[in-house]
Regions:
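Catalytic core of non-heme Fe(II) oxygenases with the double-stranded beta-helix
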Residues: 103-184, 189-192, 196-203
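Intrinsically disordered, low-complexity segments enriched in serine/proline and basic residues
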Residues: 6-7
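Short, Φ-rich (hydrophobic/aromatic) sequence segments
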Residues: 47-53, 87-91, 143-145, 195-198, ...
Length: 205
């Protein structure tokens, strides 16, 4: 894999030379996931983990447990605000990296239109045997996973067939149309917050 460091410490992990459509423009070209390590993990982890333990009671297709959906304006704890504000502060840079191989008109748009907002999020708890079947988050343009707890043996996140090992305190941002899955976990305790980000563009909402 090729590792390229953007200015604020994130990095790209995919080797686009292995992708079937890597020389084609648009949605058939490679959208590279971008990874950041959160400087606030030690401060926010315990309250957010407890929030998931208390609310993850819906069994998803694949076996994992999830909370209900929350909007980006829902901040049940101060730690939610810390995490959401941090994620939103990174999105413009991350999208610039993700879109660089896509021939997207976004790359030529003015900086004043490059505005994003965290649209929704939910907590996930993976007990032994729990996973998530192959799916995507389209029509959201950007999706993310933030990993709060990843015991040894935790299943990776697989995006477009590429396996990304998850690590505590790590944020993975990727294009919402990208198919992804989590294999059945061999152990219990894998916890994360997933969500989607909307592109505001020149709108005022």
């Amino acid at each position: 894999s090729r590792w390229i460091n953007p200015p604020y410490g994130g990095f790209f992990i995919m080797d686009i030379s292995k992708l079937k459509y890597n020389k084609l423009p648009g949605l058939t070209s490679a959208f590279e996931p971008v990874i950041y390590d959160c400087p606030y993990q030690d401060k926010i982890a315990d309250p957010l983990l407890q929030w998931i333990y208390d609310r993850a009671n819906v069994r998803v297709n694949g076996g994992a447990l999830k909370t209900k959906f929350y909007t980006g304006n829902d901040r049940d704890t101060p730690e939610h605000t810390i995490l959401i504000d941090w994620i939103e502060s990174l999105v413009v840079e991350a999208v610039q990296g993700m879109s660089r191989w896509t021939n997207s008109a976004y790359n030529e748009s003015p900086d004043s239109s490059k505005k994003f907002k965290l649209a929704d999020y939910w907590g996930m708890y993976y007990d032994q045997g729990g996973g998530a079947v192959l799916h995507n988050h389209w029509p959201y343009p950007i999706s993310f996973g933030y990993y709060l707890k990843t015991p040894e043996g935790s299943s990776p996140l697989i995006i477009d067939g590429e396996s990304i090992q998850v690590t505590e305190g790590r944020l993975i941002l990727f294009a919402g149309h990208q198919s992804h899955e989590v294999p059945e976990c061999e152990i219990s305790g894998r916890c994360m917050i997933a969500g989607n980000i909307s592109y505001k563009g020149v709108t005022d909402w």
